[in-house]
Amino acid sequence: MRKLAKYHNTTVRIACISGETFAGACEWDDPEYNLHEYNVEKESLRIGEYIFFEDDITKIELLRKEACFPVRDWPEAKEEITLWFHERWHIPLEAYRESIRACLGEESGVPQWYVVVRKNKIIAGCGVIENDFHERKDLTPNVCAVYVDKAYRNQGVAGFLLQYVCDDMAAMGVDTLYLLTDHTGFYERYGWQFCCMVRGNDGELSRMYVHKNTAASGARRLL
């Protein structure tokens, strides 16, 4: 019985027999894969660089039904992710393809792209780029293309995604992010503060928000 498979693409907290506790986006590997890779015929869970075989785990706490991943760590899905953003925002496919390609394998810096996955399906995503098509080049970098599929709205997915992105960028040394939007009252829920009105490249004024963060993300060892 593959009792750990249900935790694939979720966010969990794992307690180990060593007494250590880890939390983060979780992926499941089957016994056949682990036999080939590690000569251990057991199922396992992965959080970032950490691997937990079933015998290592004393407790699993499900934190969220979905998981957030940086696209830089998921190069095999780059075309699927590119198409997902293109279909939501109708910006030319090649523009997304070029930006997403630039982030692959990059452990720091801009651009970065992120997706939220539930049951092997992308349900939300956003990016971090230098400038989201506005005149204030000094307000950088910018969170852009924030989108949650309609079936998954009002479930905390947007806040989950935004916090992950802010924490991940802070771990890279980028603790201040900006976001251009026409929404009022939405981003304030997640710790963003209104900064100023900014004119976009289309000549229209939009609201600029700022978020400051010093936390770290990813797989976290909780001692």
Where are these regions (language model features)?
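Conserved RNA-binding domains used in RNP assembly and mRNA/RNA metabolism
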Residues: M1-K65
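A short beta-loop-alpha structural element at the N-terminal edge
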Residues: E66-I81
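Active-site rim helix/loop that mediates acceptor-substrate recognition in acyltransferases
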Residues: H86-R118, G127
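Conserved beta-strand in the GNAT
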Residues: V115, K121-N131, N142, Y147
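A conserved beta-turn-beta hairpin within the catalytic core of GNAT-like acetyltransferases
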Residues: N131-V143, R153, N201
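Conserved glycine-rich acetyl-CoA-binding loop
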Residues: R136, D149-F160, M172, R189
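Conserved acetyl-CoA-binding loop-helix of GNAT-fold acetyltransferases
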Residues: A145-V148, N154-D167, L179
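Conserved active-site alpha-helix within GNAT-family acetyltransferase domains
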Residues: A171, D175, T181-L205
